[in-house]
Swiss-Prot record:
<feature type="signal peptide">
    <location>
        <begin position="1"/>
        <end position="26"/>
    </location>
</feature>
<dbReference type="GO" id="GO:0004096">
    <property type="term" value="F:catalase activity"/>
</dbReference>
<keyword id="KW-0349">Heme</keyword>
<dbReference type="GO" id="GO:0042542">
    <property type="term" value="P:response to hydrogen peroxide"/>
</dbReference>
<feature type="region of interest" description="Disordered">
    <location>
        <begin position="386"/>
        <end position="412"/>
    </location>
</feature>
<keyword id="KW-0376">Hydrogen peroxide</keyword>
<dbReference type="InterPro" id="IPR010582">
    <property type="entry name" value="Catalase_immune_responsive"/>
</dbReference>
<comment type="function">
    <text>Decomposes hydrogen peroxide into water and oxygen; serves to protect cells from the toxic effects of hydrogen peroxide.</text>
</comment>
<keyword id="KW-0575">Peroxidase</keyword>
<dbReference type="InterPro" id="IPR024708">
    <property type="entry name" value="Catalase_AS"/>
</dbReference>
<dbReference type="Pfam" id="PF00199">
    <property type="entry name" value="Catalase"/>
</dbReference>
<comment type="similarity">
    <text>Belongs to the catalase family.</text>
</comment>
<dbReference type="GO" id="GO:0046872">
    <property type="term" value="F:metal ion binding"/>
</dbReference>
<dbReference type="GO" id="GO:0005737">
    <property type="term" value="C:cytoplasm"/>
</dbReference>
<keyword id="KW-0408">Iron</keyword>
<feature type="active site">
    <location>
        <position position="150"/>
    </location>
</feature>
<dbReference type="GO" id="GO:0020037">
    <property type="term" value="F:heme binding"/>
</dbReference>
Length: 510
């Protein structure tokens, strides 16, 4: 018997109409995953009226199998999120800073934005106090660029080696699965650089009234590289055109009693009504030689850049809700590693770790082909030798899965090379030299109104109250070092030993 000509056989099958659903069934007829039409989806097959269910009931088995596998691993952080789509329009010529096409004046780039809470789980109330994620995927002409940030402009730590410990401290007690402030402050009493961001967290900025009403920040310093190879350090900031609105403690209680999803409901509802939220994108810019002029390290993620001018470079409008939450919001893979030529990571120690960690955790959640999912696919062609992986649905015809090759060249482009960084010295494991852990936190406290200070002091003090005595007094001494009124007032609420606090604060150096 001659071998079957598969290509010819497929054509014949197609022509005969044998691989499509027979026309005797309506196109909206219920089918199984193999395309076969279902005869009954309400009653299982049984052995008679009183007998057991039959193993041959493949519709029942498939429904249960698929149901048992609906969930993928929850994000370790940023689990609860809301995704929306929109467009970014560049408005300023910054070709002197970056060769990235996304910044070309007038360039319009589709975006996907995922807002989120950070610490709490996927089904937690959105009223819980938390930093809030503000991550934007730009589908640019140079490939996908992800600006993965938060509503706070600073972070709790400056070195990625502390990240797993910080998250563990924030998460519930592994013994009881209950929140435990004492564990958190046991950790943070060893991390004085955290207090500026802790101040933000316990202020009303930790409970925004809506995603539309909060700013976004890239948090880290990045490097922009122009066509000449010249490097500038920048920080990115989204400014809400809806204004900033937060909930005070009384409002939090009122909202939570009625709506566990107030952030999502507000955003989705506004877009559904045609009230499209907008944000302007700004950059702060420093030349490499300017990094040394500050009394703190500008590449420290726990710091803002005071007095460095901001330049508006574009505007984003969010105008479409997702079509399917799981396929888009849950499967979107945001990662600082997704960069394009003209945008590079700085030497920020936290960012360097996030470049690996975020891409790695997305691969763990979604598998090796996660970036091939529709929400993650770039708008430009992908051309490399990466192959296979579970659930690979691509159609690859090339026999060349390596590089270099004469059979099928995939040349690199020198214009996409990374910038060069002059280095000297030896390898080390040491703290940064310009920590300045206290000044910016004190400045932040003093910037708040009287009511904002009162709300902050009350929330921070209540959280500290049941903390182990030594950790409590250390935390209070840091607050006292930042601003004596701040430390004194929180100590009153937390019932700390003020004389001990003052003594500890006297030994601290900024």
């Amino acid at each position: 018997m001659p071998l079957l000509n598969w290509s010819r056989h497929m054509v014949c099958l197609t022509a005969a109409g044998l691989i499509t659903v027979p026309t005797v069934y309506a196109t909206d007829t219920l089918t199984r995953d193999n395309g076969a039409v279902v005869g009954d989806n309400q009653n299982s097959q049984t052995a008679g009226a009183q007998g057991p269910v039959l193993l041959q009931d493949v519709q029942l088995l498939q429904k249960l199998q698929r149901f048992d596998r609906e969930r993928i691993p929850e994000r370790v952080v940023h689990a609860r999120g809301t995704g929306v789509k929109g467009e970014f329009t560049a408005s300023a010529d910054i070709s002197d800073l970056s060769k990235a096409t996304v910044f070309k004046s007038g360039e319009k780039t589709p975006v996907f934005v995922r807002f989120s809470s950070v610490v709490h789980g996927n089904h937690s109330p959105e009223t819980l106090r938390d930093p809030h994620g503000f991550a934007t995927k730009f589908y640019t002409a140079d490939g996908n660029w992800d600006l993965v940030g938060n509503n706070f402009p600073t972070f709790f730590i400056r070195d990625a080696i502390k990240f797993p410990d910080m998250v563990h401290a924030f998460k519930p007690d592994p013994r009881t699965n209950l929140d435990n402030d004492s564990r958190r402050f046991d950790f943070f009493s060893h991390v004085p650089e955290a207090t500026r961001t802790l101040t933000l967290l316990y202020s009303n900025e930790g409970t925004p009234a809506g995603y539309r009403f909060m700013d976004g920040n890239g948090v880290h310093a990045y490097k922009l590289v122009n066509a000449k190879g010249e490097v500038h350090y920048v920080k990115f900031h989204w400014k809400s055109l809806q204004g900033i609105k937060n909930l005070d403690p009384k409002e939090v209680a009122q909202v939570q009693s009625k709506d566990y999803s107030h952030l999502t409901n507000d955003l989705v509802g506004a877009i559904k009504k045609g009230d499209f939220p907008k944000w302007d994108l700004y950059v702060q810019v420093l030349k490499p030689e300017e990094l040394a002029k500050f009394d703190f390290d500008p590449l420290d993620a726990t710091k803002i850049w005071p007095d460095v001018p901001e330049k508006k470079i574009g505007q984003m409008v969010l105008n479409k809700n997702v079509d399917n939450f799981f396929q888009e919001t849950e499967q979107v893979a945001m990662a600082p590693a997704n960069l394009v030529p003209g945008i590079e990571p700085s030497e920020d120690r936290l960012l360097q770790g996030r470049v690996f960690s975020y891409a790695d955790t997305q691969m763990y959640r979604l598998g090796a082909i996660g970036l091939s999912l529709p929400v993650n696919q770039p708008k430009v062609a992908v051309n490399n030798g990466n192959q296979d992986g579970a659930l690979n649905t691509g159609h690859t015809t090339s026999g060349v899965n390596y590089e270099p090759s004469r059979l099928e060249p995939r040349p690199a482009d020198d214009k996409a090379r990374y910038s060069e960084l002059p280095l000297s010295g030896t390898t080390q494991q040491a703290k940064i030299t310009r920590e300045q852990n206290f000044k910016q936190a004190g400045d932040l406290f003093r910037s708040y109104s009287a009511k904002e200070k009162t709300d902050l002091v009350q929330r921070f003090g209540e959280s500290l109250a049941d903390t182990h005595t030594e950790s409590k007094n250390i935390m209070l001494s840091v607050l006292y070092k930042e601003d004596r009124h701040y430390g004194t007032r929180v100590a009153e609420v937390a019932k700390g030993d003020l004389s001990k606090v003052k003594s500890l604060a006297a030994s601290l150096k900024d």
